[in-house]
UniProtKB/Swiss-Prot annotation:
The lineage of its organism: Bacteria, Pseudomonadati, Pseudomonadota, Betaproteobacteria, Burkholderiales. Transport of potassium into the cell. Likely operates as a K(+):H(+) symporter. GO terms for molecular function: potassium ion transmembrane transporter activity; symporter activity. This is Probable potassium transport system protein Kup. The gene is kup. Pfam families: K_trans, K_trans_C.
Amino acid sequence: MNDTIHATDAAHAPHSTQQHSMRALAIAAIGVVFGDIGTSPLYSLKEAFSPAHGIPLTEGSILGVISLLFWAIILVVGIKYLLFVMRADNNGEGGVLALMALSLRPLDSKTRVAGALMALGIFGACMFYGDAVITPAISVMSAVEGLEIATPHLSHLVLPITIVILIALFWIQRHGTALVGKLFGPIMVLWFVAIAALGVYHIVRVPGIMAAINPYYAASFMADHLLQAYVVLGSVVLVLTGAEALYADMGHFGAKPIRIAAYGLVMPSLVLNYFGQGALLIQNPKAIENPFFLLAPEWGLLPLVILSTVATVIASQAVISGAYSLTSQAIQLGYVPRMKVLHTSELAIGQIYVPVVNWLLLFVILCIVIGFKSSDNLAAAYGIAVTATMVITTVLAAVVMVKVWNWNRLLVGAIIAVFLAVDLGFFGANLLKVAQGGWLPLGIGALLFFLLMTWYKGRHIVKERTAADGIPLEPFLQGLLAHPPHRVSGTAIYLTGNDKLVPVSLLHNLKHNKVLHERTIFLTFVTRDIPYVRDDKRQTSRDAGGGLYIVRAEYGFNETPDVKAVLEEFGRTHDMTFELMDTSFFLARETVVPTHLPGMSIWRERVFAWMHQNAAKPTDFFSIPANRVVELGTKIEI
């Protein structure tokens, strides 16, 4: 968020300052955005020529596969994401949930089209988690496997070292990564320069590899090998893992720095390295054992293993941080139960830590590493989540082009037809790998999709039941002031999800305690379909008379509601002061009771009730002092 503001401000700064700011943002983006796609050379080409595919290591096949890799990067990364998808920003924010919110804005939320788009967006988010458990596993494992080439007698330590690195990576998350994060950019710049240099060294020795730029070789390879070539597409897509991060992280850096980094360093370095690996294979087909590490001279192997390991840790960090951010967005948009979200930096708003997500990710990743044992075995599981998200992004972007930008439908149809042909081709090729490991991200995505849709549907039913039984707030307050109960000193704040209805906690308090505080505030938090809400637009309040106030605080889906900040702003507006330790917070503790009423099947209602019971307490989520909270129970039948 702060980086984007600086990028905008730079436009008004002197030219040298603007260049420096843009360069700094581009380097920072290289450290965060491009880690995943930048470490793909470790395993992509090796997997494309897997013995299971039955593709002979002839010069023609090598040129064909390298040509496929090259044009996949150009079409998907260079054109689709960088030129088209990144235009579809939601107030500067990218990512599948932000894109979904943008595509839904011009539509009636009750239509089937809106429902289908919402489901697509949520499924895309769920598939990200399927990718998030594989990226750290395959990236770190493939880097550590370089030991098998550098020092073969240490090959038995690959698995233990991988596990130790992953545990350490997740263990430090709670302390934040701001300190070491400053090194990510320069280290990844070194990584891209190194892999480019390794590629150039071998291209110079076999310059004929540059013929693969001609798409004829890709087309010829597909025509000659047909089904085998289509299976290879499932491995070619590994060069695109992380492409979605270009769009998802746009809100942190801005589109221009990401484009500068991609076109200026990342894409050229990746292309040079892949062409270098191809040149090496033409010279020495036996190098398919590990074409990336065998690019290096013998003296450079161990340094390359170390640099690769650091680069894959950085790539994993980007995915982990992305999982935290996506979870936080989903919580605010109402698709996920409340979870404890901790801010690990006072300066960077995006630096957050979600303990539940952290330890669940580590558990699943360790199970994957121990179960699959090598990056070769895991490669089959990689790709299906990425390609599914790519297809969903294309569909949602098409809706934005037509409904939000009002582009010509024929033009949009032509553009999207090309993108979908590529995306669906890759997705179909990955479906062939379901039995070999593709079931893993699909299963994770499907399970999460079921849970998220159950939560969303359940919350909708709860709101309907509450609204049906609710009492309008304004007339109730007028009646309350006309016949007031006993007033007691102090401030009471009633947190409520609907500022039009009387909070259940107030009804219970009046029923049992028969008192009303001299200063009573009804506080409602609302999440908008934009990432951030301006401070001057955040809060509205109205005086209902008699010391009663109705306050509505709006937040973007990238923000965390802040009770203390809301009360401070309200106090400034109404010339009041608040002390949290002298304020009583009244909350309704809802107990969901599954029934046979219309809504969901009884077993889904039980799942929802379990999720509801295990959601983080409002006191934890809103950072309210626990000893200042009064929870009043209420049962809701669904």
